[in-house]
A protein has these predicted regions:
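Mixed-charge, low-complexity segments
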Residues: 43-44
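Active-site-adjacent pocket-lining segments in enzyme domains
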Residues: 2-8, 12, 19, 26-39, ...
Length: 165
């Protein structure tokens, strides 16, 4: 089974990965969905779900097939920067990374979106949340965009996010 890792943290937007995870985790897809956190302590989502991560950032499998970064206010507060080594690993190994809502700003701030087509909540908001962002010319006013193994979507695009490859 190919593993899909969904990054969870206190305050993660639990509805954003719901459609894609339900489809990927279905029988006969060849995929299984697992969660990754900074540690293996229970995380509480925006909706109040208590979720214990399957993996921590120190013990995740190297052969995962997709990394999903969900939204949440922790991205705005710069509390999720510790996931950067996992994202770097995925990008360097050409493993697709999906980012939705505020997680897109993290991708922008760290240079992943500077040279590829992408979406996000709004260009103006992204620029306020990602001062080092240089991808203005590649921003598309679209619900979701896929380019170079990176999938981006605004916070209202959970279905479109699930459909991108």
């Amino acid at each position: 089974m190919k593993e899909v890792l969904v990054f969870i943290f206190d305050g993660f937007a639990d509805w954003e990965p719901a459609y894609i995870c339900a489809e990927l985790n279905a029988p006969d897809t060849g995929y299984t969905v697992k969660t990754i956190g900074f540690d293996k302590k229970a995380k509480v989502s925006m909706g109040g779900f208590h979720v214990i991560p399957d993996y921590s950032i120190n013990d995740y499998p190297s052969d995962f097939s997709l990394l999903i970064l969900t939204g949440g206010t922790a991205w705005i507060e710069q509390k999720n920067n510790g996931i950067l080594p996992v994202v770097d690993y995925a990008v360097n190994k050409h493993i697709p990374v999906g980012a939705i809502c505020n997680a897109v700003n993290f991708m922008a701030e760290n240079g992943y979106l500077d040279t590829i087509k992408h979406s996000g909540n709004t260009l103006e908001f992204m620029k306020t949340q990602a001062p080092h962002y240089k991808g203005d010319n590649n921003f598309l006013e679209a619900q979701a965009v896929s380019d170079s193994n990176i999938i981006t979507a605004n916070g209202s695009a959970t279905l479109e996010f699930a459909k991108k490859k």
